[in-house]
Amino acid sequence: MNKDNKFENTVGIESTFPKDMPNEHGEIPVWNSENWFYEDVIVGHKIRSLRRTISEGEAMQFNCMGLDMHPYVGDEHFAKNEGMFQKRLVAGAMVFSYGLGLVATNCVNSFSYGYDRLRFIKPVFIGDTIYTIRTNMEKKPKYEKMGLVRTSYEVFKGEGEIVLYCEHLHSVLYKKPEDFKDKYEKK
């Protein structure tokens, strides 16, 4: 946080200085990428995504790529005439993927450890608009070189109806590993 107690923007602040491009290019901050460390994670910090409408074409493309041909997501006739919602659903895997992708920070020091408590709370239909709120829930030292951070993802549709919830565990590099030498779990 800065002196005004506001969260500072971390997108593109520093470069990762790649060695396989000209120096003058490598010095330019990387767009849509972050380089925060474990020590920089603020428990309670939230971000909200832009909204995103899910179209029929992309829903069918996602279904085909994932081989999800369930009648609720791929059969208009079934969904309309025999299904309990009278219209086609967006695949839950797509809502999960899009929901998390909307707030992906592309941090070069963070690595996915897994997901907990994934719940599909309400259906999402073709043409619905979704957005996501991500919250840093907790962090704890875990390994010699990185700690574990738990974040929640809440995906909403329309004017704030929650449709998906999950918690993401990710390991994040320490800026100063020596500060955690007596705090992480020993094997």
What are these regions (language model features)?
Residues N2-Y113, K175-K187:
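Hot-dog-fold acyl-thioester-processing enzymes
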Residues K3-F7, T151-Y174:
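Short peripheral tails and domain-boundary helices/loops at the edges of structured domains
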Residues W36, I42-S49, T129-Y131, L148-R150, ...:
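Intrinsic-disorder/low-complexity, polar/charged segments enriched in Ser/Thr/Lys/Arg/Asp/Glu/Gln
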Residues S55, E138-K139, H170-V172:
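A short acidic/small-residue loop/turn micro-motif
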Residues G114-G158:
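Hydrophobic beta-sheet segments that form the core/acyl-binding groove
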Residues R117-K122, H168-L173, F180-Y184:
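A structural preference for long, well-packed, hydrophobic secondary-structure segments
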